[in-house]
C-alpha cells in the first residue's frame, strides 16, 4: 500500500490586467500588478527587489518593468518577505541567479512546501532585527512577531524613509483575513508604523502616509473589537453568515463604510473568520504569548538540518 501523495496547488496563470511602476524617492520605486504591490531599490551596483509576485505573467511583467526603468542594471538581491505564494511563489524564475534573502521561519515553510518555483533563500536571517547591505542599500529586516503568514518581514529602508510590509491596507479589502495572526498583528504592525517612515508600502492596495497608516490600524482594531462583542454578547448566532453580517455592518458602517472596498457581505465573511479566531483561541503557536516556540518546531529544526548538510557539502546555496 502506498502513502497518499501531497500536492501543492498553485493559482493558474492569467494575463496581467494592470501594472505600474512609480518613483517614491530618489532610488526607491513601487511596482503594482493587479492589486499586489512591492518595492525595488536602485543600488550602486544593482537592483534590490522585494518578492516576486505569484504567477508567471505577473513575475514576467515585474521583470519587464524593472528593465524598462533601470536598463541593464542587474537584480543582485531579492528579499522574500513572506512565505505566501501569491507574493513569493515565483522567486526562482524571477531571481534568475540573484541572491535570495528570507527569514528562517518563512523559509522553513517554503522548504516543507517543496515548490520548485518558490526558491529557497541563499541567505537566511533569524530573530527580530537583522541589518544587511546589498549594492550600497542598507536594509533592516524586522520580524516583531507573527502578523501575516509565517516569518513575515518588514523591510525597512531607513536611509530612504520607506518601509514595506505585507498585511495592513489602506482600504477594507481584507477578504477573510487569510493567515492573519490577531494575537500580535496590531501590536507588531504598530511597532513598524512607529518607525515613522514617510512611506508605508503594503503588499496590497495603495502606498500609505502616516495618517493613512493610523486609520488603517484603527479600522482593524475596531473590526477585531466588533467581532469580540459579537461573540461575547451571546445573542448573535456567530456561526451563520447573515446574522454576523448584519451585526458587524451595524457596528462598523457609520464610521467605516467610506473606506475603499467596504462591502457588508465581505465584512460578514471576514467577521466569521475573526469570530472563529476568538472562539477557538487563535491558531497554533503564532497566536499565543509564546510564539518564539515556533523556532523550536520540527519543521524549523528539519530546515536547519537541511542547511547544515548544504554547508557541509560546501555549496551553501539552496
UniProtKB/Swiss-Prot annotation:
<protein>
    <recommendedName>
        <fullName>2,4-dinitroanisole O-demethylase subunit beta</fullName>
        <ecNumber>3.3.2.14</ecNumber>
    </recommendedName>
</protein>
<comment type="subunit">
    <text>Part of the complex DnhAB composed of the 2,4-dinitroanisole O-demethylase alpha (DnhA) and beta (DnhB) subunits.</text>
</comment>
<dbReference type="GO" id="GO:0016803">
    <property type="term" value="F:ether hydrolase activity"/>
</dbReference>
<dbReference type="GO" id="GO:0008270">
    <property type="term" value="F:zinc ion binding"/>
</dbReference>
<dbReference type="InterPro" id="IPR036866">
    <property type="entry name" value="RibonucZ/Hydroxyglut_hydro"/>
</dbReference>
<comment type="similarity">
    <text>Belongs to the metallo-beta-lactamase superfamily.</text>
</comment>
<keyword id="KW-0378">Hydrolase</keyword>
<comment type="function">
    <text>Involved in the degradation of 2,4-dinitroanisole (DNAN), an insensitive munition ingredient used in explosive formulations as a replacement for 2,4,6-trinitrotoluene (TNT). Catalyzes the removal of the methyl group from 2,4-dinitroanisole (DNAN) to yield 2,4-dinitrophenol (2,4-DNP) and methanol.</text>
</comment>
Amino acid at each position: 500500500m502506498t502513502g497518499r501523495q501531497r500536492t501543492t496547488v498553485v493559482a493558474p496563470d492569467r494575463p496581467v490586467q494592470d501594472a505600474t511602476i512609480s518613483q517614491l524617492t530618489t532610488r526607491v520605486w513601487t511596482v503594482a500588478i493587479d492589486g499586489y504591490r512591492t518595492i525595488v531599490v536602485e543600488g550602486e551596483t544593482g537592483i534590490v527587489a522585494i518578492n516576486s509576485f505569484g504567477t508567471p505573467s505577473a513575475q514576467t511583467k515585474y521583470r519587464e518593468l524593472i528593465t524598462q526603468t533601470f536598463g541593464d542594471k542587474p537584480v543582485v538581491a531579492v528579499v522574500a518577505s513572506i512565505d505566501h505564494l501569491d507574493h513569493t511563489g515565483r522567486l526562482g524564475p524571477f531571481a534568475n541567479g540573484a541572491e535570495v534573502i528570507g527569514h528562517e521561519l518563512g523559509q522553513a515553510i517554503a522548504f516543507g512546501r517543496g515548490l520548485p518555483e518558490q526558491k529557497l533563500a541563499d541567505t537566511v536571517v533569524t530573530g527580530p532585527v537583522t541589518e544587511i547591505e546589498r549594492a550600497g542599500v542598507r536594509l533592516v529586516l524586522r520580524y516583531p512577531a507573527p502578523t501575516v503568514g509565517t516569518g513575515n518581514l518588514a523591510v525597512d529602508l531607513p536611509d530612504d524613509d520607506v518601509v514595506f510590509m505585507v498585511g495592513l491596507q489602506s482600504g477594507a479589502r481584507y477578504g477573510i483575513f487569510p493567515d492573519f495572526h490577531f494575537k500580535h498583528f496590531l501590536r507588531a504592525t504598530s511597532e513598524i508604523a512607529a518607525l515613522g517612515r514617510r512611506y508605508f508600502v503594503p503588499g496590497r492596495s495603495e502606498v500609505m502616509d502616516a495618517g493613512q497608516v493610523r486609520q488603517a490600524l484603527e479600522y482593524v482594531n475596531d473590526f477585531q473589537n466588533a467581532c469580540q462583542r459579537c461573540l461575547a454578547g451571546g445573542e448573535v448566532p456567530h456561526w451563520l453568515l447573515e446574522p454576523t453580517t448584519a451585526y458587524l455592518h451595524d457596528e462598523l458602517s457609520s464610521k467605516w463604510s467610506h473606506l475603499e472596498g467596504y462591502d457588508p457581505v465581505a465584512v460578514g465573511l471576514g467577521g466569521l473568520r475573526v469570530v472563529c479566531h476568538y472562539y477557538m483561541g487563535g491558531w497554533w503557536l503564532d497566536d499565543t504569548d509564546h510564539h518564539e516556540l515556533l523556532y523550536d518546531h520540527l519543521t524549523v529544526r528539519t530546515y536547519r538540518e537541511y542547511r547544515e548538510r548544504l554547508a557541509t557539502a560546501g555549496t551553501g546555496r539552496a
